[in-house]
Amino acid sequence: MFARFCKAIPAKGRAFPSVNASIQSRLMATVRNQRVPHERATFTIRDGPIFHGKSFGARTNISGEAVFTTSLVGYPESLTDPSYRGQILVFTQPLIGNYGVPSAERDQHGLLKYFESPHLQAAGVVVADVAEQYSHWTAVESLGEWCAREGVPAISGVDTRAIVTYLREQGSSLARITVGEEYDADQDEAFTDPEQIHLVRQVSTKAPFHVSAADPQCHVAVIDCGVKENILRSLVSRGASITVFPFDYPIHKVAHHFDGVFISNGPGDPTHCQDTTYHLRRLMETSQVPIFGICLGHQLLALAAGARTIKLKYGNRAHNIPALDMSTGRCHITSQNHGYAVDVDTLPSDWKPYFVNLNDSSNEGMIHKSRPIFSTQFHPEAKGGPLDSSYLFDIYIDSVRKYKANQAAFHPQRDSIPSPLLVDLLAKERVGVQPTIGMQNVQAAAAAAAVAAAA
């Protein structure tokens, strides 16, 4: 049907009959042929098969860990998810790119509406077929144009079913994409193992910054291990102003300034983040602040509690994975992207499993038996994926507000006299993120500090 519609498009410069100029302009823009130069490309799995296809991205060679996702939609969100850093992403969906790539538009909070980070994070893209003609009202460029602009190689015309079958049977493997030339498949130096790289250091913020809620009800510290934009949005939209810290920031030293601590998702092996694990352990020893972790944050919290993590054979990357809530018996369809899991048998006695994966029985969450601390391996913020478990953010924010109320009862001046740390952080409002509100916060904090000093 779409092909018949494309054939019906008038020649360049001619008008669509009975269509106003605005709609005509949009139609011409969204169905134009977005062609990028095609060259021979090769996808090589180390000690495995070689696949030949065509390049539709950047003219460069790359290597990394080959993983696959069974998600049907959401490729702009997946490819910008920092958790995919260093990985070559293979899509099982036969056709990718048919709705193009949207703009870097931001929402009322100053957060990206359609992407999970400002740049494409995956090392490479592998698809069976790529749509050169795209059609969607938010699209501004094709998938090939986007990959080329971001410097990411991409290959189409390969048997992704055979690739995924190999990865499922042999496990996630090192691989490479070469464009325009071929290398000896036996040269190990041509393969880079991202697991040997501290990937979190690459994607974490380099300095703290602040994002204000329109009507702030609480203040949450976010440990950024590669946080997704929609996680920040899920917190801010629920009335939490957030201050985002680098992954290795000594959060236990400033936790008393906040009503809650959140640990984000991120890429790579959780055991690389030893500083983060130490700071979280000290945080749980010295503070009763509510804590919530997602994905890598879940794994880091488990390590801090004394548990261990394990590497899965080929990971879980999809938007339709069932997870069972062990406290209610309810099943949630979840969005997941991880290659490691918590070894539930190593959880300390004061913790218990929260969710379990119904496909492979791996751990999907844990919760403390007596304190407001819990975490999930899956992504309740989705983007893309279902929102079955988004209520977990409500549970967390409720615990944060209760903690704030209890602290206010014991320390009435806690919120009226801002600390020098918070005044400084509020001055570092994230660029492009509600600068007016941020400035109001800075001015209010400065005024309150002046009144307190005068008294």
Swiss-Prot record:
EC id: 6.3.5.5
One GO process term, biological-process aspect: pyrimidine nucleotide biosynthetic process
What residues make up the catalytic site? C295, H379, E381
Q: Please list the residue ranges annotated as the Glutamine amidotransferase type-1 domain.
A: 219-406
The reaction(s) this protein catalyses: hydrogencarbonate + L-glutamine + 2 ATP + H2O = carbamoyl phosphate + L-glutamate + 2 ADP + phosphate + 2 H(+)
Q: Does the keyword Nuclease apply?
A: no
Transit peptide location on this chain: 1-28
Q: Tell me the compartments it is located in.
A: Mitochondrion matrix
- Report which superkingdom the organism of origin falls in: Eukaryota
| Gene3D superfamilies in the record | 3.40.50.880, Carbamoyl-phosphate synthase small subunit, N-terminal domain
Q: Name one GO cellular component term.
A: mitochondrial matrix
Q: Which UniProt keywords apply?
A: Amino-acid biosynthesis, Arginine biosynthesis, ATP-binding, Glutamine amidotransferase, Ligase, Mitochondrion, Nucleotide-binding, Transit peptide
Q: In which pathway does it act?
A: Amino-acid biosynthesis; L-arginine biosynthesis; carbamoyl phosphate from bicarbonate: step 1/1
- Subunit record text: Heterodimer composed of 2 chains; the small (or glutamine) chain promotes the hydrolysis of glutamine to ammonia, which is used by the large (or ammonia) chain to synthesize carbamoyl phosphate.
Q: Which PANTHER family match?
A: CARBAMOYL-PHOSPHATE SYNTHASE ARGININE-SPECIFIC SMALL CHAIN (PTHR11405:SF4), CARBAMOYLTRANSFERASE FAMILY MEMBER (PTHR11405)
Record family assignment: Belongs to the CarA family.
What protein am I looking at?
Carbamoyl phosphate synthase arginine-specific small chain
Q: Which organism is it from?
A: Aspergillus clavatus (strain ATCC 1007 / CBS 513.65 / DSM 816 / NCTC 3887 / NRRL 1 / QM 1276 / 107)
Gene symbol?
A: cpa1
